[in-house]
A protein has these predicted regions:
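Arginine/glycine-rich "motif VI" loop of SF2 helicases in the C-terminal RecA-like domain
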Residues: 58, 124-132, 158-160
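Glycine-rich phosphate/nucleotide-binding loop
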Residues: 108, 129-132, 140-145
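Flexible, glycine/proline-enriched loop segments at strand-loop-helix junctions
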Residues: 108-109, 133-137, 164-167
Length: 195
């Protein structure tokens, strides 16, 4: 298997959610990553959107790097079909390795774990710990309440507009993914067909 052109870390739910569009979008993300020569980095789970995005990447011939804490492996939540499956001791180890292996980050719909991972890489970016692009897939308005809240935080002057500018949002994964890869400075021979 050839070296990947880029590596994108995807955060998403370990459940499928209540809207079939969530699963469809996770599948599109996985297929797009593989079809464009990329590598998926994710939390190593086999359930929910996590399993769907990994399975779609693998089915399309792509590489998948899973990173999962030992405690979750012991609960039999690990996706054993990953190209690489790294079993780490703690959640902190997991998040660090995922961030190190990524050129860009994308948050799909998910729960508190997805939110926490998204906020952490966003915090690291605003502190200058990395300069990797961060995307938020606002599928069917899933993240609208959070974006309203964040804009109120800006109004209350606990966040600056420049911090909001550090995240890219779109409701369409197939529009957001090429922008993230381009912003990461990775090879983008596919951009003319995607944007």
């Amino acid at each position: 298997m050839a070296e990947p052109l880029f590596s994108i870390c995807v955060y998403c739910g370990s459940k499928p959610g209540d809207d079939p569009a969530f699963a469809k979008s996770a599948q599109q993300v996985g297929q797009w990553v593989a079809q464009h020569g990329g590598q998926l980095v994710y939390g190593g789970g086999r359930n929910g959107l996590m399993g769907i995005v990994a399975d779609a990447t693998l089915a399309a011939g792509g590489r998948v790097v899973g990173v999962i804490p030992r405690a979750l492996v012991e609960k039999e939540w690990a996706h054993t079909g990953c190209t690489e499956l790294h079993v780490v001791q703690t959640m902190h180890d997991r998040k660090r390795m995922m961030a190190e292996r990524a050129d860009a980050f994308l948050a799909l719909p998910g729960g508190i774990g997805t939110f926490e991972e998204f906020y952490e890489v966003w915090t690291w970016r605003q502190l200058g710990y990395h300069n990797k692009p961060i995307g938020l897939l606002n599928l069917n308005g899933f993240y609208n309440p959070m974006l309203v809240f964040l804009n109120s935080v800006v109004q209350h002057q606990f966040l600056g507009p420049w911090q909001m500018d550090l995240i890219q949002t779109d409701s369409d994964a197939l529009k957001l993914l090429p922008r993230l890869i381009q912003a990461a400075g990775m090879p983008t021979p596919f951009l003319s067909e995607s944007i």
